[in-house]
């Protein structure tokens, strides 16, 4: 048996903002029809539970101009109204709003105070019309899986390993080589000092014998 995800909505005179609250949605399918039928389905959770919802919106919509963005925590839709006017509610006037549909107060503005559009900077959108109603969209799960396909992040390890391959970094161990060289220089000078000391000792013995004689 399917479950209903929480759906939040807000509007401007020319558009409706619909947010489907469902984290880590997989195989997300969103469909929008000109007559105003909005349907959603996806799986989520460790058990792969099926979530579905179907809403008959208050009026007709412009599918071609409507957009959708699939995120990690939710699916955000900007639905363009076919006619720029305020809706009394999200669903048709002769229907009661389902219990899982709520007002999105973070995006809501009053009709007398038609504020600016919602800031969508940083969000990636696709057009409903250009995606065939988004029916074939693999959803966030597939998208994230595709990122896993980059596997290239594991490439960071290869890159780091490659730096080891530079050997030059190991060359920083060259500091030890410099130290070894200085040690060698010191050891080379020691025999010379010993010879000088021996010659000095012989000279002192000669002087002592001369004084004795």
UniProtKB/Swiss-Prot annotation:
GO terms for biological process: chaperone cofactor-dependent protein refolding; chaperone-mediated protein complex assembly; negative regulation of cytokinin-activated signaling pathway; positive regulation of gene expression; protein folding; regulation of auxin polar transport; response to heat; root meristem growth. Transmembrane segments: none annotated. GO terms for molecular function: Hsp90 protein binding; protein-folding chaperone binding. Pfam families: CS (PF04969). Residues 188-213 have a biased composition (Basic and acidic residues). It comes from the Eukaryota. Residues 168-213 are annotated as: Disordered. Residues 176-187 have a biased composition (Acidic residues). Residues 2-91 form the CS domain. Gene3D superfamilies: 2.60.40.790. One of its GO terms (cellular component) is protein folding chaperone complex. Belongs to the p23/wos2 family. PANTHER family: CO-CHAPERONE PROTEIN P23 (PTHR22932:SF22), TELOMERASE-BINDING PROTEIN P23 HSP90 CO-CHAPERONE (PTHR22932). This is Uncharacterized protein Os08g0359500.
């Amino acid at each position: 048996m399917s479950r209903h995800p929480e759906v939040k909505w807000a509007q401007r005179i020319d558009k409706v903002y619909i947010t489907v609250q469902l984290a880590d949605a997989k195989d997300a399918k969103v469909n929008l029809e000109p007559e105003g039928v909005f349907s959603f389905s996806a799986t989520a959770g460790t058990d792969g539970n099926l979530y579905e919802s179907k809403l008959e919106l208050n009026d007709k919509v412009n599918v071609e101009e409507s957009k959708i963005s699939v995120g990690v925590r939710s699916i955000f839709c900007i639905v363009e109204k076919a006619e720029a006017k305020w809706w009394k509610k999200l669903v048709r006037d002769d229907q009661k709003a389902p219990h899982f549909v709520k007002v999105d107060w973070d995006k809501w503005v009053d009709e007398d105070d038609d504020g600016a559009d919602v800031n969508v900077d940083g969000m990636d959108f696709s057009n409903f019309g250009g995606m065939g109603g988004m029916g074939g969209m693999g959803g966030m799960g597939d998208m994230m899986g595709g990122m896993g396909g980059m596997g290239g992040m594991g490439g960071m390890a290869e890159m780091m390993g490659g730096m080891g391959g530079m050997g030059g970094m190991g060359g920083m161990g060259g500091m030890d080589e410099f130290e070894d060289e200085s040690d060698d220089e010191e050891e080379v000078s020691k025999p010379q000092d010993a010879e000088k000391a021996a010659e000095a000792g012989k000279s002192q013995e000669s002087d002592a014998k001369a004084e004795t004689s």
